[in-house]
Amino acid sequence: MTNATQHANENLTIHLKVKDYATWRSGYDGREKGRLSAGITNGRVFRNAQDPNDVVILQDVADVAKARAWLGSDHLKTEMQKNGVVGSPNVRFAAVA
């Protein structure tokens, strides 16, 4: 399996709590350009039926190193705080089995 093929099979799952879903969602949607530049695509957002401020995001990743760098950036951390993310998100990379 080539390196490119391996990267095409990577997924990113982020579980987070937010103060207000509508505020957070507006910020999330506004960061699409940043996600694309980090090789993160095809984002699907899910909300807990019992707690609409409990959010899970599932995304495809083309380049794990680029995605990790973007996720760890001070700019993104500031934006997440500004948009109401509570605490630290649970971030997991997984390969399609």
Regions found by a protein language model. Give the residues of each.
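Short S/T/G/P-rich N-terminal loop/turn motif that feeds into the first structured element of a domain
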Residues: 1-79, 83-97
